[in-house]
């Protein structure tokens, strides 16, 4: 089984071909292809290549499946003894992708 570790949106993801993944929002239309050049590691069976910091010539190709927003995260700011409470919420945008190929 081949897999790779990519960097996008300031996070690292372990990906394999055919896998669906929710990443930080990309400004790419649904159905289009996107290429990730920042590949930190590529493994194909027992053959593992680790980059310093990235693997030269390696790329991961994916197709954008959908754009959306995660569930709401609610927070409460509370000041004791002051009769003050503030409720807030946040919904982060995401891009769902399907990994179509790993090239090393």
Swiss-Prot record:
Keywords for the protein's UniProt record, in alphabetical order: Ribonucleoprotein, Ribosomal protein, RNA-binding, rRNA-binding
Pfam families for the chain: Ribosomal_L21p (PF00829)
InterPro entries to which the protein is assigned, alphabetical: bL21-like, bL21-like_sf, Ribosomal_bL21, Ribosomal_bL21_CS
Cellular component terms per the entry's GO annotation: cytoplasm; ribonucleoprotein complex; ribosome
Any GO BP annotation: translation
Superkingdom, natural source: Bacteria
UniProt entry tagged with the keyword Transport: no
GO-annotated molecular function: rRNA binding; structural constituent of ribosome
UniProt similarity note: Belongs to the bacterial ribosomal protein bL21 family.
Described function: This protein binds to 23S rRNA in the presence of protein L20.
Subunit and interaction comment: Part of the 50S ribosomal subunit. Contacts protein L20.
Name the UniProt record assigns to this protein: Large ribosomal subunit protein bL21
Gene for this chain: rplU
